[in-house]
């Protein structure tokens, strides 16, 4: 029988796994420093506001960042337009940050067992996210049309920064998975056209994918919402897994056409599971039905982004239990 680590890595690579792993409890995720403000003490100040390493102000939405999340402080903008970015943006000084101590300290705190558990490093605030965190969402969307040259320049600079983050992460942590984070879609469509994504973002993602693979690591990309139009592009540039594939995407279509080329992490009806009044058995039934439907259609791992400890606990228990029972052909 494979370990949790072996089963998860096999499923992410498209190899045979002995069972279906549960990601939240099945591996340890280390967060690369500098991209968020988590507060001096979330228990004492769960709704505190403070700066990340870029100077962007964040407000925590509760005491548990993994569930409660955080958001850019209401009304905050560092500046207004991308023709000003060189005057205002100061990239975090990676050479002077205690990256090794932070990453290793997180491993120690989380009691990582590298023999039994896969390790990922979450790198938040990708190119588009960082732009909208600096100048606001509306300004960021307009910038593709108003300041295309400046956006290209900023994204190229962001790419160099992220490449260095990857280099340092491999040097000091050597994780199995790099989990890049850049949201590109609403519930029903992408924030921008696929053509905009292909011009501005796809070349950056290709460089990141290549560097991650040079080190022998797996590239899992986080993007909430509807991104079905660019799944073939993600396959083309070498993304190994997309997380979370939400149900507004046509999961049946994605699994039929790309299920042997990219791992679909998700596929559960997050909104139904989190709805007030949804019972424990309904949550468990949703997990089982999607596992029955997709596990043998390709590279599939069930997953949700939880908004409550209750749903997370029920979901994780059902995936863990049923993942050992379901027949994998």
Stretches found by the model and what they are:
Residues 1-27, 90-329:
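Active-site loop segments of alpha/beta catalytic cores
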């Amino acid at each position: 029988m494979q370990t949790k680590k072996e089963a998860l890595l096999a499923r992410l690579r498209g190899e045979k796994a002995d069972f279906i792993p549960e990601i939240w409890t099945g591996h340890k995720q280390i967060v690369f420093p500098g991209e968020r403000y988590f507060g001096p003490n979330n228990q004492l100040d769960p709704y505190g506001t403070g700066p990340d390493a870029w100077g962007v102000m964040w407000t925590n939405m509760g005491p548990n960042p993994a569930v409660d999340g955080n958001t850019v402080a209401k009304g905050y903008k560092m500046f207004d337009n991308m023709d000003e970015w060189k005057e205002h943006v100061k990239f975090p000084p990676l050479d002077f940050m205690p990256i090794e101590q932070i990453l290793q300290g997180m491993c120690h705190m989380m009691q990582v067992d590298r023999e039994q558990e896969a390790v990922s490093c979450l790198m938040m605030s990708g190119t588009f996210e960082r732009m909208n965190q600096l100048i606001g969402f509306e300004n960021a969307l307009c910038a593709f049309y108003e300041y295309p040259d400046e956006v290209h320049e900023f994204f190229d600079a962001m790419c160099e920064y992220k490449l260095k983050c990857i280099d340092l992460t491999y040097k000091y942590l050597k994780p199995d998975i790099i989990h890049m984070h850049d949201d590109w879609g609403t519930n029903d469509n992408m924030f921008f056209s696929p053509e905009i994504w292909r011009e501005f973002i796809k070349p950056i993602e290709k460089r990141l994918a290549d560097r991650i693979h040079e080190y022998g690591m797996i590239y899992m990309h986080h993007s909430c919402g509807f991104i079905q139009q660019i799944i073939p592009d993600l396959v083309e540039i070498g993304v190994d897994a997309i997380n979370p594939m939400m149900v507004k995407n046509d999961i049946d279509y994605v699994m039929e056409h790309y299920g042997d080329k990219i791992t679909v992490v998700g596929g559960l009806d997050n909104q139904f599971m989190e709805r007030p009044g949804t019972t424990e058995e309904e949550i468990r039934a949703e997990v089982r039905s999607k596992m029955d439907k997709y596990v043998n259609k390709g590279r599939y791992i069930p997953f949700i982004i939880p908004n409550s400890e209750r749903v997370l606990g029920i979901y994780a228990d059902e995936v863990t239990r049923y993942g050992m029972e379901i027949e994998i052909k």
